[in-house]
Amino acid sequence: MYDKVKLVLHALPIGYNWQSVLSRIVAYSYRADGTGGLGWWHGRTIIATETCVSFEGSLPKSLWGHNTHTMSLNDVECCIMMLSEDLGVPMYDAEVEYVEFAHNFEMSQPPVFYLRKLSGIKGFTPNDWAEGKGGTVYFDKEGVRVKFYDKISEAKKKKELPKVGRSSLPEYLFQLYL
C-alpha cells in the first residue's frame, strides 16, 4: 500500500491563513519574506504558504511511528483525515504529486537469502552502486525503481520498531518498495 507521499493542497478554503496551519503543529522555520513556513506533523514535513499547504513523508510512520506493517486503504484514509483535522485544512482534497508504494512480506528464511535470487527479475537491471548497502537491492526500468530490503534490520538500525507489540513482529520481514 502507500508509504511515502507528497500531497499539495492548492484549493485553499475561504479564510485560509498559513500562520494558523503552522500554529497547530511544530513550526520550525519561516520564510524571510513572510509568505509561509515549515513545520513537523508527526515527524513529517508540512509547508504552509499563502498559496498552498503540502505534506511530504511516510503515511505509516505518521500514523504508527514505523512502517513494519502494510497500511490498508482504511488506514490511509484515517491518516489523511487526521492530517486534515490537525492542520485545519481539507488535505483530503489535495493533489498527489507523487506516491511510493511498499508492501511487507513475512518470509521463512532471512531476507538476504532472497536478495541473492532477485538478480533474475526479467527486464529489470540491478544497480551495481547498491552493492554493500546493507542488504538492499535496487532495480531500475523505464523510470521505475524497485527496492527490496530486510525491513526488520532496517527498522532496528533506524530505531523505528514499534514500541508495543515488538514480540509479535515476524522474524524475517522483507519489504518491496516501488
Mark where each language-model region is.
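Structured, helix-rich domain cores that form ligand/interaction pockets
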Residues: 1-178
